[in-house]
Amino acid sequence: MEEDFNMSTPGVKVGVXEEEKKLSYYKYYEQDLAPVPAEKIAILQGGPIAPEKCIPFDERNKFLKGEDDEYANIGFGVAADGTALVCNTTYMPGVTGEMLDWWFPWHSVGSDLRYKIWDPEDHYFARAYPASYVVDPNVPMNQKTWGVDHYIMEDVGPGPEFLKLCFKRPADFGYDESIIGTEKCESLVCAIGESSCAAAMTHKWHPYKDGVLFESRFWIGYRIDEEGNIVKAIPEGVSIPPFVPQGLFAHNIKEFTNLAAILPTLYAEEKDTF
């Protein structure tokens, strides 16, 4: 199955309510999305990376430490065991770790417009449960996703789809929390996605030049079992078709290019209106 990922022409934006048009950050919905760099579009259209370049889920602490140079850091592919990988690295000038710690909980509460401005063509809503935990001023900003589920509607290629993202404390995801706060991992968020294709997800970031380097990994084909363990979700001998990670890669490079463009001013304007 071949997919045509043409990102050169703008798509149709999702709908907004009249109440959303009155919000102070509606202007970010109205503006054009930031263009995806040509080199990333070339990677998208260039086909999957080799299976041996897909970092195994069991080696995820290498990713956190920044000791994963033998693996790809931008691209998509299918691993030898049939699971799939999406990886992306985004330089975000003018962005700080504090802004990203704020962004991930902020966009999941309040108006649906908060999620829409991230990618106005593909994002419909993201709603946190329990929202009371997210908005609790006693919860540290970098912990406001821990144990929180985001109920989402977005389009990563095939059409709008419902998704549940189960965010985890890093230790519950199998991460060594002593790595957090070190040179290659200032902070992170991690979650298990429940949808038509289960996946484990991590976004981490650290200072780089005059901003941050934002690094994403999606291990497609993993789920949470009854005991709370993250396990492979596909049968032996079955492989995820390459168009699945390709579609997610296309979406990822689009949404995080746009987030990098809007976050510095958005944070300056909205950081006190959680």
Swiss-Prot record:
Keyword Iron set for record: no
Q: Name one GO cellular component term.
A: cytoplasm
Q: What is its main location?
A: cytoplasm
UniProt-listed Enzyme Commission number(s)? 3.7.1.4
Q: How does activity depend on temperature?
A: Optimum temperature is 37 degrees Celsius.
Q: How does activity depend on pH?
A: Optimum pH is 7.0.
Q: Where does Zn(2+) bind?
A: 123, 154, 251, 255
Q: Which InterPro entries would you find in this protein's record? A: DAPG_hydrolase
UniProt GO molecular function: metal ion binding; phloretin hydrolase activity; protein homodimerization activity
In the UniProt record, does the keyword RNA-binding occur? no
Keywords, in A-Z order:
Cytoplasm, Hydrolase, Metal-binding, Zinc
Quaternary structure and interacting proteins, as annotated: Homodimer.
- Report the family membership: Belongs to the DAPG/phloretin hydrolase family.
Summarize the protein's role: Catalyzes the hydrolytic C-C cleavage of phloretin to phloroglucinol and 3-(4-hydroxyphenyl)propionic acid during flavonoid degradation. Also hydrolyzes other C-acylated phenols.
Q: What is the name of this protein?
A: Phloretin hydrolase
